[in-house]
Regions:
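Conserved catalytic alpha/beta core of Sir2/sirtuin-type deacylases, generalized to analogous enzyme cores
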Residues: 1-180
């Protein structure tokens, strides 16, 4: 069931970055962005050109063998016609490299995200209501000077924010940082 769901719903190979992804990539290239912490699993930040991306829920564009830990790219699992893709090296199941409910967050991504929360002057929270526990917990770890929230709807942290925009993150970042 998981593999069927993964193949039919999570195939994000054809997705393209939006204005927010592109502006964040430019900000990173200009030295204005220390990193991106994302709970999205679509790889669009990297597709836009960002390199300092910490995927706290993993990536749908990676998969691995649950036994020998061999890594596989997105085409292997999405194009494989077997009911459950099996590792050609050891014969065990291959699973998507995404964090499912009840699983622990990837340690390296989590540790890097915590490091950013501890060392950054400004945190921009964008495109999330902070309803998912891991994102909300990350936001509470930030103790820098400025908290900016950009989300179409309300969030739980607006009372602590220095600036709040109830608009799309792409339009706000494009307006503030400029379009190319």
């Amino acid at each position: 069931m998981l593999i069927f769901y993964f193949r039919k719903v999570l195939d994000c190979r054809a997705a393209e970055p939006n204005a927010a992804h592109l502006v964040l990539s430019r900000m990173e290239a200009d030295g204005k962005l220390a990193g991106i912490v994302t709970q999205n699993i679509d790889g669009l930040h990297q597709k836009a050109g960002s390199r300092k991306v910490h995927e706290i829920h993993g990536s749908a564009l990676r998969s691995y063998c649950v036994h020998c830990r061999t890594q596989y790219g997105p085409d292997y699992i999405f194009e494989n016609q077997d009911p459950v893709p099996m590792c050609p090296k050891c014969g065990k199941m291959i699973r998507p490299d995404v964090t499912l409910y009840g699983e622990f967050l990837p340690h390296l991504a989590y540790d890097n995200a915590v490091g950013l929360m501890n060392t950054s002057d400004m945190l921009i929270i964008g495109g999330t209501s902070l309803a998912v526990g891991s994102a909300a917990q990350m936001a509470h770890l930030f103790h820098g000077r400025y908290l900016v929230i950009i989300n179409k709807g309300p969030t739980k942290m607006e009372g602590k924010a220095d600036l709040v925009f109830h608009e799309s993150i792409g339009s706000v970042l494009s307006e503030l940082y400029g379009d190319d």
